[in-house]
Amino acid sequence: MVYKFETNNLLLRFFELSDAGMVQQLAGNEEVARTTLAIPHPYPDGAAEQWIESVRQSSEKGDSYAFAMIKKDDGMLIGNMSMGVSKNHKRAELAYWVGKPFWGQGYATEAAQRVIQFGFEDLGMNRIIAAAMTKNPGSYKVMRKIGMKEEGTFPQHVLKWGTYEDLVFYGMVKSDYLKRLI
């Protein structure tokens, strides 16, 4: 099934192959790639097309959902808001990146709010988590703003560009999400 959502300022839709150039440009920025778990730098030619095809297949199977964040006012792709799903455990993990020119404008928070709504209300998830490198406060501020609670820090949990990085984890259960709606 194909999902598409609108927020005040954004259209969230599945990625299309025509997005590849913008994905490579935005995600390939060294400052964006530096604090993400899987984005390479430099971003190789052809990698965006491969990634888009991979996430489209996963989205169609319901294993994960990767939404292109598109500004409604000008149609510009500005980032990615994804949610990996564990159907057996009714659990999901939120992950995202935003192109540097669009940092600090509330787009990630707006998209994350809509995607966790989708996770809890449409997919029936019981728990949604997210993680960020401790050196990326902008990312975990988004988690706080959408109501997630800090659950702990895993020291030296990932190896990024030859350096072990700490990850801070945030989470929310459905009952807490529902309380926020009252």
Where in the sequence are the language-model features?
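A short helix-loop-beta-strand connector motif used in the catalytic cores of GNAT acetyltransferases and
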Residues: 53-68
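Conserved GNAT-fold acetyl-CoA-binding loop/helix
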Residues: 33-54
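Acyl-donor (CoA/ACP) binding surface of acyl/acetyltransferases
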Residues: 1-31, 66, 70-182
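Short, conserved alpha-helical segments within structured domains
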Residues: 40-44, 65, 135
